[in-house]
Regions:
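Catalytic PLP-binding core of fold-type I/II PLP enzymes
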Residues: 16-40
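A C-terminal functional module that forms or caps the active site or interfaces directly
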Residues: 145, 149-196, 200-207
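Glycine-rich, proline-tolerant flexible connector loops at the mouths of alpha/beta enzymes
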Residues: 1-15
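Acidic (Asp/Glu)-rich catalytic clusters
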Residues: 22-27, 86-92, 159-162, 183-190
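Active-site beta-loop-alpha junctions enriched in small/polar residues
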Residues: 3-7, 37-41, 74-76, 101-105, ...
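C-terminal helical cap(s) of enzyme catalytic domains, especially alpha/beta-barrels
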Residues: 182-188, 203-238
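Hydrophobic faces of well-ordered beta-strands that scaffold small-molecule active sites
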Residues: 2, 32-34, 71-73, 96-100, ...
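Conserved anion-binding
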Residues: 36, 40-144
Length: 238
């Protein structure tokens, strides 16, 4: 799940590095989630969707630009911002993750506001489920949701609202989320959630637990962190 802002800050060379990262991951057989959090309307949203998930036309030819498998999308502008992504997802058989309840501490300033007695994130979750009915895969829809591990009780409610949506769960590890917090993000069959840990794995060697590896052996520290993460989540799911 490469975070595009970490590349954008370096300008054109950074964007070239982002493309190389995506290509390298795909060469290794990995599913790539472009953490781009795009949100606009009409032709602008369509351009974002085509640039990251589809193919852009140049004259009589077309080619894939960044070519991720999934992208994160901000729903604040409503269906006008999401529908262009849906069109590309259905054409390319790719997917999006819509921000529903994010893991950051101030997310509640807007996402928890009540509308007719219900928090906004529940209404967004219902919209994600509705969008998903228009773009179904075999078991799950092409429209997933971002729900932070730091809000497990809200995750429990949202899983019931969106039974056919993959839930991308950030906030594990560096932001404080634990395996026990993740149980309700999964369906009863143990599927349906994608748990993300970025800093907790990439920079594992900086943590006291893995400091013995040292910076020069950062990859070994990352492997150990992944193994511990898998054991933690499996243990919680039973």
């Amino acid at each position: 799940k490469p975070q595009i802002a970490m590349y954008e800050q370096f300008g054109i060379p950074g964007m070239q590095a982002f493309k190389k990262t995506v290509d390298y991951c795909k060469e290794k057989g990995l599913v790539v989630i472009g953490d781009i959090k795009r949100g606009d309307i009409g032709s602008t949203s369509a351009a974002y969707a085509v640039g990251h998930l589809g193919k852009v036309a140049v004259g009589s030819k077309s080619y894939a630009a960044f070519d991720e498998d999934f992208a994160t999308v901000n729903p604040y502008l409503g269906s006008d911002g999401v529908n262009p992504f849906l069109d590309v997802c259905k054409e390319e058989k790719k997917g999006i993750f819509v921000l529903v309840k994010t893991s950051n501490p101030s997310s509640g300033e807007f996402q928890d506001q009540k509308i007719d007695g219900r928090p906004l994130y529940e209404l967004v979750g219902e919209k994600v489920a509705a969008w998903g009915t228009e773009a179904m895969g075999d078991e799950y829809s092409y429209v997933g949701a971002v729900v932070g591990a730091t809000y497990p009780e809200m995750g429990k409610v949202l899983r019931k609202i969106m039974p056919k949506a993959y839930i991308l769960v950030p906030g594990y590890g560096a932001q404080g989320g634990k395996g026990k917090d993740l149980v309700h993000f999964f369906n009863e069959d143990g599927l349906g959630a994608i748990v993300n840990s970025s800093r907790g794995i990439i920079a594992a060697y900086k943590q006291e637990k893995y400091a013995k590896f040292g910076a020069e052996n950062f990859a070994d520290a990352s492997r150990a962190a992944v193994e511990d993460m898998v054991a933690d989540i499996k243990g919680a799911l039973g």
